[in-house]
Amino acid sequence: MPTPRLRQFWTLLILLTGTVASMFAASQWAWQRSLHAESDSVQRQLALYGQTLAQRIDRYRTLPEVLALDAQLQSALQRPLRPAEVEQLNLKLEQANGASQSSTLTLLNSDGLAVAASNWRSATSNVGQDYSFRPYVQQALAQGRGSFYGIGVTTGVPGYFLSQAIRDDHGHTLGLVVIKIALQELEREWLQTPDIVLASDAHGVVFLASQDAWRYRLLEPLDDEERSELTATRQYSDQPLRPLELRVDDRLDNGGRLVRLLSADLPPLPGRALWQTQPLPGTPW
C-alpha cells in the first residue's frame, strides 16, 4: 500500500464569522488590532479543541495493549475453535467493550479475518469479515500496532481504529485486537458552539465537522495515487468527497487567514471569515 503523502500537517480548523464581520465597521487601525487579538484568541481555543480530541482517543489507547496480553485471546489464535469457544470470546469482548464504553472490540487472526467481536449479536457483526486490506491491520501485523480513521466497512459507522498485535511467547505474531472509538459524541459537543470546527486527515479530507454539510470535503485536490489509496482502503466508503472552495483574501502573521466561502452547495457565510489551523500532536492525522 502506498505511503500517504503528507501535504502540510494534520489540522483542526475553525471559522469565525460574526466577530470578524463586525470588525469591518471599525477604523482600519482598530480593525487590524482587533482582528489579530481575535485570531490569537481563536488559536488558544483551537488548542483546547485539539486537547479534547486527543484526550478522547487517549482514554482507550491502553486497552488493546492490555487485551493483547490476555492468555485466552492468545490461545484462541493458535488453533481451530469450536462454536462454543467463539461464543465465549464474543462474550469476553462484549463485556470488555461495555466496561470501556468504546464502539467495538474485534479479535483478528494473522490473515486479517475477524475471529470474534463485541458486536456479535448485531446484524452487522464483524465476526467472519475480512479486514486484511485495512491499514490498521497491516500496520499491526508489520509493526506491532496501528491506527486509522475511516467508515466501518461492515457497520457503515465511522470511527477511529487502534490496533495491537498479539504475539506468542516466542514473539511470533498470532493476530491482533482492534478497538474502534466513535467520535460522534464529540461532534455533537461541537454543535454547541457557533463556530465551524473541522478536523482533516493527511489527504486534506475533512472527517470530523461541527456541521454535517462540511464533513467529507476536500481542502485540496487529490491526485490519482491518493484516490487509488482511498479506494483500496475504503476509508470513506462511497462518500463523494466534494471540494471545499475558499478564496483567501488576507493572511495574518500568526497563520490565520481571512477567507470567503465559494462552495455554492454549503450554507453561505456572512461575508469574510477568520480561518485558523493548528496541528494535532499525538494523533496520526
Q: Which sequence ranges carry the predicted segments?
A:
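Core beta-strand residues in small-molecule sensory/regulatory alpha/beta domains
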Residues: L108, R167-D168, S200
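Amphipathic coiled-coil signal-relay and dimerization helices
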Residues: S75-A76, G112-N119, V206-S210
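Extracytoplasmic/periplasmic ligand-binding sensor regions of membrane-associated signaling proteins
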Residues: A117-E189
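Juxtamembrane extracytoplasmic/periplasmic/luminal helical "stalk" adjacent to the first N-terminal
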Residues: Q8, L15-R79, R145
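Extracellular/periplasmic juxtamembrane segments that couple receptor/chemosensory ectodomains to their
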Residues: S228-W285
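Short, hydrophobic-rich beta-strand element in sensory/regulatory alpha-beta domains
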Residues: P64, S103-L107, V197-L198
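Solvent-exposed, extracytoplasmic
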Residues: E87-A99, L176-R234
